[in-house]
Amino acid sequence: MFLKVQKSDISGSISIPGSKSHTIRSLFLAGLAKGTSVIRNPLLSTDAVSGVNVCRAFGSTYDLNNESYVVNGMGACPQVPENVIDVGNSGTSLRLGLMTAALVDGYTVFTGDYQIRKRQIGPLVEAINNLGGKAFTTRGNESAPVVIKGRATGGYTKLDCVTSQYLSSILLNTPLLEKDTHVEITRLNEIPYVEITLWWLDKLGIKYSHNSMKEFFIPGGQQYRPFECTIPGDFSSATFFMVQAAISERELVLTNLDMSDPQGDKAVLDILADMGAEIKYDHNNIKIKGKSLKGREIDMNSIPDALPAMAVAACFAKGETRLVNVPQARLKETDRISVMCSELTKMGADISELPDGLVIRESKLHGAAVKGYDDHRIVMSLAIAGLNCSGETVIDTAEAMNVTYPGFVESVKSCGGKIELI
């Protein structure tokens, strides 16, 4: 599908859908708990469905009633899946599921779409082997398809976390192992996502300790208890509308966002305020009004998912903006550094690549035919660019939005946006 976008005056109020990070973690934890859990306001997207499918394969049941999941969890001993588990496009579901598979007394095989079959999982595979499981990639290239055999027991491993999902997988599953686990971290990107995982462990009474996130100690023999929760809004999805308001000099009100939540992408609000946007907070409502933005250097390591949207914001900021220290952005669904450089160039941006980021100078953008590369964040970021430049912008692979924000087009239209799926 294609997304056709024209310059629009956007203002009004948008309710942000549930957090993907919280939704998928809650789905896995409900499955690992013995008993019935209730998850309200989950994200309903293809990524979340992938998480449900992974957990169902291990023996839990998931029923969606009135936009809430009722989960009957399998507990600490997942069953052997009846078939290969296809995670679709969900890297989170794959990586969290790998260590869950190491709890199984038998074999589990994971695969996914063409993007998943290129994404790195080597360090996590190595860690599973070190903790007493058996794991290997079928092509020997550190990417899915991957075979896991449990049951892991615990022990010591080093872990190179080019993505925080490796550590989250270990943290969520090792409390259920027989022995204690000691993880030494050699590199850790995206720390706020680990903080979300630790928030869940705290909520469910799991014991652990860490040394400034350089070493983690997780006692074995623990159990998850069933729980009820309400998923907060997704700051990563809200980023597109934060940028939209900041560059348009109009006001948007974003609702269903909890500033006390550990999601890292709420930092985008402070960044945009520092660049010149006007931000006001009223309980769970955030008012954003654009003013003249000024370029600056921004360390994106903790908020890599915001890179595509911030690249668009930088095109409208006076002077030069440098988005730096985010090499892991090259390892997402696409190489987001390269892709945003190439597609914004088509729209007239003065932009160049760094090994770990982008350099962007104020630019006068124009509409163009651009590629979305089957990447939800690329598609939606280019749509925001198209809403704020002359001419018509057409973006391919628009169906990728369903990964995290199926209602994106409706949200834009509700505030006056000229946007259409064709």
Swiss-Prot record:
The lineage of its organism: Bacteria, Bacillati, Bacillota, Clostridia, Eubacteriales. The keyword Transferase applies. Disulfide bonds: none annotated. This is 3-phosphoshikimate 1-carboxyvinyltransferase. The gene is aroA. It is found in: Cytoplasm. Monomer. One of its GO terms (biological process) is amino acid biosynthetic process. Keywords: Amino-acid biosynthesis, Aromatic amino acid biosynthesis, Cytoplasm, Transferase.
